[in-house]
């Protein structure tokens, strides 16, 4: 190995010893595997961010996080590809960064596993109440994710005629009506009796959905089915349990496959935030 390396070096006599110097331009530093991986991640994150922004409808600006991730991955790739820079960094700092990265990955994996564990949640028949969590209501009707929730709720309500339904959701600045009003009209037009539909039109978050809806039922006695999209069921159930719902079951509706990575990442941060402030 040393003999092969010497072929690329220039001998220089000094103090009766031969010192080998690198020829300029003859050898280039190889990119590390880590640098290549982070560069690929940066490109994928940027492409996904642009795809959501240009071609998909989105209800929040959370997709911009993918752009931020692209920048972070790009910077990490740049640092890893500079061997001299890496050598100058303190060993303790590099060890701490690696440990934090591994712990972060483990935390992310555990939380995402919990989210996935409720992807196929089903509910037993005969519930007293159903709560449908609101989502964006557009000028031409429910958004994709909300329509999936309403259709899943409709299936259950048709099979369980004694179950009442609470449609929960306020009105955003870009919504023509409150989410509750829109859902009320959607379900009534689909054949659900109006007297079975209760409106809660003040909430602006999942926590408020459940808190405000609790005044319309007895959360200590009533059996309640919570309808939301698959990626959202785990957090919804845990928030309800923490709030005192004694008999709560999630009912998972499908979600938009192309938006699933974005929704899963958003749920991760949502769970971490709710856990941090004591709501979970």
Which residues make up each language-model segment?
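Cytosolic-side transmembrane helix boundary signature
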Residues: 68-100
């Amino acid at each position: 190995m040393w003999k092969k390396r010497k072929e690329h070096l220039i001998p220089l006599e000094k103090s009766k010893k031969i010192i080998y110097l690198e020829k300029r331009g003859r050898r280039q530093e190889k990119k590390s595997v880590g640098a290549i991986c982070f560069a690929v991640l940066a490109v994928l994150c940027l492409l996904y961010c642009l795809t959501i922004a240009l071609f998909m409808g989105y209800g929040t600006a959370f997709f911009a996080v993918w752009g931020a991730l692209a920048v972070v991955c790009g910077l990490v790739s740049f640092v890893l590809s500079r061997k001299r820079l890496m050598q100058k960094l303190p060993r303790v700092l590099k060890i701490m960064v690696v440990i934090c990265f591994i712990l972060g990955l483990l935390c992310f994996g555990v939380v995402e596993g919990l989210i996935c564990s409720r992807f196929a949640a089903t509910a037993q028949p005969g519930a007293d109440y159903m709560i449908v969590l609101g989502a964006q209501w557009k000028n031409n009707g429910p958004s994709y994710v909300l329509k999936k929730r309403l259709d899943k709720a409709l299936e259950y309500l048709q099979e369980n005629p004694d179950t009442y339904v609470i449609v929960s959701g306020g009105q955003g600045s870009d919504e023509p009506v409150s989410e509750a009003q829109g859902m009320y009209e959607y379900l009534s037009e689909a054949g659900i009796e109006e007297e079975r539909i209760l409106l809660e039109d003040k909430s602006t978050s999942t926590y408020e959905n459940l808190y405000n809806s609790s005044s319309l039922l007895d959360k200590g006695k009533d059996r309640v089915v919570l309808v939301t999209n698959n990626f959202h069921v785990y957090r919804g159930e845990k928030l309800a349990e923490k709030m005192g719902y004694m008999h709560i079951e999630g009912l998972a509706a499908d979600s938009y496959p192309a938006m699933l990575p974005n929704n899963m990442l958003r749920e991760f941060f949502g769970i971490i935030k709710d856990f941090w402030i004591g709501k979970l």
